[in-house]
Amino acid sequence: MVLDSTLREGEQTPGVNYTPEQRLEIAIALDEVGVDFIEIGHPAVSEDVFRGMKLIAEQGLNVELLAHSRALIEDIDYVLKTGVDWVGIFFCLSEACLRKRFRITLDHALEKISRAIEYAKDHGLKVRFTPEDTTRTEWANLKRAIRLAKELKVDRISVADTTGSTHPLRFYTLVKKIVNFGIPVNVHCHNDLGLALANAIMGIEAGATLVDATVNGLGERAGIVDLAQIITVLYYHYGIKKYRLDLLYRVSNLVSEITGISPQPNYPIVGENAFTHKAGLHVSAVLKDPRFYEFLPAEVFGRERTIYVDRYAGKDTIRYYLEKFGIRDHGIVTSLLRKVKSSREPFTWEKLLEEARRVKE
């Protein structure tokens, strides 16, 4: 399963602040993709965030809705007012956090967590508990917290690689140990070392049943797992076909337009160049069968394949465009290719058509 956190983790990207209407528009688009959960925000942040969350909860979407919350009764009261069914309660339990951030003992922290979970449960909420910075928290502390969560009938535990620095094999081992407690496990993997997707996959292999992601990999610092990538991994490697791959590019563009942040051109699945072919040998092969250089066809993602034209082009590149232009004189291929290869600038299709007409004359 997939939880999308574009509206919570994604909004922690510097420069990103959604209006209530934008929050709703993104939630509707994610519901159409078919994600299982949407983390729609942290209602205690501001009145604007709260209003947007309430607006989403009133829509009757098919997806499960979850609100983020500190282990505070007042935060949970905000969550209850939004009308969602799930609350995600988090608290850091590492010795460093307990001593330096909170200046409390582990016993005190567990009492605080227990009060928050019991309050949420007593008020009808389903609870996901996240020991923040799970991967760097001492196992003795984690074990006590997870046992407490099980006693309190927490619905899900989230394993958070908060600094995005854990080695995938170590992440696998940790998730496996936590899965053995018998509580359904989420994984929340940051991308500070570029390991978010690898860690998410290792989490799945270890028995986690839900992965957190955001559109375009938005989030604090280097962000978290990208939604399009994890959904495609689930489809391609695990045979999970319930998500709308053909809508991933559209939702990426929607979020880019709203946030003003676009993926890098070479970004997988949704980047501008993800299905662009340049080298002549590649183009020649792709025109025969896209599977030579595409693991899935561009059309699966609602995209079009692009053939790029510059000095790396080959004759098949030129023939491809001549046919698109309706020019059947293949005798000009060599002359036109010579023109392309002598230029330091790429050729747009308009420029190529103009040059083809000139050469043909």
Swiss-Prot record:
GO terms for biological process: lysine biosynthetic process via aminoadipic acid. It catalyses: acetyl-CoA + 2-oxoglutarate + H2O = (2R)-homocitrate + CoA + H(+). 2-oxoglutarate binds at R8, H68, R128, T162. Residues 1-251 form the Pyruvate carboxyltransferase domain. Mg(2+) binds at E9, H188, H190. Its EC number is 2.3.3.14. The active site is at H282 (proton acceptor). Keywords: Amino-acid biosynthesis, Lysine biosynthesis, Magnesium, Manganese, Metal-binding, Transferase. Pathway: Amino-acid biosynthesis; L-lysine biosynthesis via AAA pathway; L-alpha-aminoadipate from 2-oxoglutarate: step 1/5. Its cofactor is Mg(2+); Mn(2+). One of its GO terms (molecular function) is metal ion binding. Disulfide bonds: none annotated. Catalyzes the aldol-type condensation of 2-oxoglutarate with acetyl-CoA to yield homocitrate. Carries out the first step of the alpha-aminoadipate (AAA) lysine biosynthesis pathway. Belongs to the alpha-IPM synthase/homocitrate synthase family. Homocitrate synthase LYS20/LYS21 subfamily. This is Homocitrate synthase. It comes from Pyrococcus abyssi (strain GE5 / Orsay).
